[in-house]
Amino acid sequence: MKRTTIHISAAIALLLGLAACTQDEAGFLPEGAEGTPIVFTATGLNPAATATAGTRAPADGNWTGVQSVAVMMDGMVKTYNVTPSTADPTSATLTSTDPYYWTNHNDITVTAWWPYTAGETTPPAVKVKANQSAQKDFEGSDLIVADGQTVTYGSPTLRFTHRTARVTIVLTDYTEGLASVQLTGLSTEGDNPAEITPYDKGSNTYTALVAPQSVAGWR
């Protein structure tokens, strides 16, 4: 009886080994409770030369201050927390307490965006604020998206880009304190404002975020 038991155990081990090989060849990961949690690296924000002094926000290519982003896969949206890199805050790590999981090595398609309002199932349309004279309203007019990107198992990177356009105005030959700057003649498509009061970033420079368009003029 002992010899029979040994032979049966060996046969079971052989079958398990064959099953593991078949699973690996098919591209599936070793079995776990749900798989391996997906952790993303967020990149793509451009630290423009016109970055606003004193601000730390996506508008200036910086993830510092961003708490979370929306991440959509297969029609489902989950919240991922943002941890900016201490060495390079233009990149960040995205993790979640309720993550998506890798169940195999196949590529996945992901859309992500910021800012995110609970209940959104797709990235919102670009809609900027009419009065961006306050820093929070300038920064709050931004929209960054990683749209329908292919993410690989070995390099789960999301490259975000700005959906807004940035207009910067530098004043010369004027008396300080007497200037009033206003962007006018803007497209109102998507319920965007026809006029925008820009943010005074100092050094005779004003900046604003607008929906992508040709700027007709300002005063």
Where are these regions (language model features)?
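Sec-type signal peptide cleavage vicinity
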Residues: K2-A11, L18-R219
